[in-house]
């Protein structure tokens, strides 16, 4: 067992809760101790939902372990049905209750409820949250989608949209953008699931001609099942960035039998022109490290390199089930992917890569802050500030605009650097002190890594080093000292500084 202060994913029953909370008319009866009710806060606090997720906990306590905990579950399930009258119910156990081996599936079946009861077998000690969401959605689709039915020939084929859940990164806004794209193409949407769907809606999934998978982490297994049983092909292109959105539009248009040209001719994204118009000194070649779930990490890496001209120096994911996709993308950039859910390993990799920008999760925001590196959150897990009240998608052409702002705004642009150069030697405003209205206390700059042997810097070289922007000054210092040490130079001069810069720029 590994003790940690942070985890990228919760146990699999949290994934099941994300699916249940996204749907209507579905209730989740969870065999869990009293302490596991903390999960409600993920939805009411982080996502700021105005209602609790549709979950009934058995909430057994220590004193109940000497009695019949199975009876507790049966009573909770019966009361949940009587109170909420759902169209369907899912039942399962949390990681703690799994140890009791009470068999929630068999207990619920014995109750003989007049609705579908779908048991969930979520091995909490082998799997995690995203897998739990995928397995839950797959089980629901398998149980409720109904037998395959003949579909009439149509001039324009319809689709289902699969994947968006509660507590997903910008899922609500992404769905709005994708629906607008499909509307502009004239493609009818049959069902959106899990978000906003009911069990009755899942029974209509087979009426569509194909499926659109927005988030493979959640919907790939269900889409593969529908492809096998209902002969529904699926499109699995995450439309994140201008290029991916164009590819998505062409793919769904081909499946539906419509012309994508009108939509592509009027895409309305400002990212391509903005990326070309920004001074390349402050955009092109910026070193970026990307980490997150597979869908968002791979997409962010492609946008950063192909559309903004950044240099990718690190790519990784915490989602082991999708490690192959991330490794393939990393290899395309000449990198080795980091596949780990240990935030300390991620911090070590970021520090070693010395990026100028980090794109990651809420944890990478903390890591980057400690290292003094700009950061933008592009993937779950996220915190409350990453669930904005405004419309802020990542998908579609408007999502590309949002993504441009997200990736570029943390960077220091030309005017800001020019102002720093103007006031570098000012006793009140130079970058070695905090803002004057905060009392002028010294800035806690990230210290350079300790070196085995002390090196002497000439006064002129130190003065020249201060002209380097503070957020890459540590990197410039360490590279120069490494250059001097490798050549046994006793004194670092201005010439040494520029020789080192030329050496490491090759």
From Swiss-Prot:
Binds 1 [4Fe-4S] cluster per heterodimer. The cluster is bound at the heterodimer interface by residues from both subunits. InterPro entries: ChlB/BchB/BchZ (IPR050152), LI-POR_suB-like_C (IPR013580), Nase/OxRdtase_comp1 (IPR000510), P-CP_red_C (IPR042298), Protochl_reductB (IPR005969), Protochlorophyllide_Rdtase (IPR016209). Its EC number is 1.3.7.7. Pathway: Porphyrin-containing compound metabolism; bacteriochlorophyll biosynthesis (light-independent). It is an enzyme of class 1 (oxidoreductase). Protochlorophyllide reductase is composed of three subunits; BchL, BchN and BchB. Forms a heterotetramer of two BchB and two BchN subunits. GO terms for biological process: light-independent bacteriochlorophyll biosynthetic process; photosynthesis, dark reaction. It comes from Methylobacterium sp. (strain 4-46). The active site is at residue 279. SUPFAM superfamilies: Helical backbone' metal receptor. One of its GO terms (molecular function) is metal ion binding. This is Light-independent protochlorophyllide reductase subunit B.
